[in-house]
Amino acid sequence: MYIPMVVEQSGRGERAYDIYSRLLKERIIFLGGGIDDQVANLIIAQLLFLEAEDPDKDIHLYINSPGGVVTSGMAIYDTMRYIKAPVSTICVGQAASMGAVLLAAGEKGKRFSLNHSRIMIHQPLGGFQGQATDISIHAKEILRMKEELNSILADLTGQSKERIEADTDRDYFMSATEAEEYGLIDATFTRKPDSGGTP
């Protein structure tokens, strides 16, 4: 994938940044694509760096993700909760599966979506093969993760755990407006606010 470069002029001359490094200077992190350990480690490193720079200033996490590995997503989730700096989340395109959990995990009042984004929640996926005892162990772990994610979504959205369990039994797609009504986000935007707004 080609990554654009941005050239900045200063009194010292020119300096070239890749686009993601330039966004990081503005405290913007972009999560685009599937979530795995490598992606999670990059996102976590950026969160920790920005918190070390200024623990009181908002970090803006833009999300366009179909989800991915639950444990990788939970590592990002836990780091968002761990750091002192508030993390604002903005969905652009889609936030599905773990992407939706991370979207909802933003600072309350600072969870946003652009108007035509799609948000989807569901139960964790798993496929295992091997000895029967190993399959049984993995099945128990998937059920434990499902229970944990349902509790997290109930806490983040204000929905009852029973409703979350029913809705995540199958893929549950929402528009940005529906996600706002559900409690996954706090507002939808078609344009960037003129002043003081996060996105």
UniProtKB/Swiss-Prot annotation:
Gene Ontology terms describing biological process: protein quality control for misfolded or incompletely synthesized proteins
Q: Which reaction does it catalyse?
A: Hydrolysis of proteins to small peptides in the presence of ATP and magnesium. alpha-casein is the usual test substrate. In the absence of ATP, only oligopeptides shorter than five residues are hydrolyzed (such as succinyl-Leu-Tyr-|-NHMec, and Leu-Tyr-Leu-|-Tyr-Trp, in which cleavage of the -Tyr-|-Leu- and -Tyr-|-Trp bonds also occurs)
Catalytic residues identified in the record: 97 (nucleophile), 122
Q: For this UniProt record, give its keywords in alphabetical order, as a comma-separated list.
A: Cytoplasm, Hydrolase, Protease, Serine protease
Location in or out of the cell? Cytoplasm
Could you say which enzyme class this protein belongs to? hydrolase
Q: Does the keyword Cell inner membrane apply?
A: no
User: What's this chain's function?
Assistant: Cleaves peptides in various proteins in a process that requires ATP hydrolysis. Has a chymotrypsin-like activity. Plays a major role in the degradation of misfolded proteins.
Spell out the subunit comment.
Answer: Fourteen ClpP subunits assemble into 2 heptameric rings which stack back to back to give a disk-like structure with a central cavity, resembling the structure of eukaryotic proteasomes.
Its recorded name reads: ATP-dependent Clp protease proteolytic subunit
Name the gene that codes for it: clpP
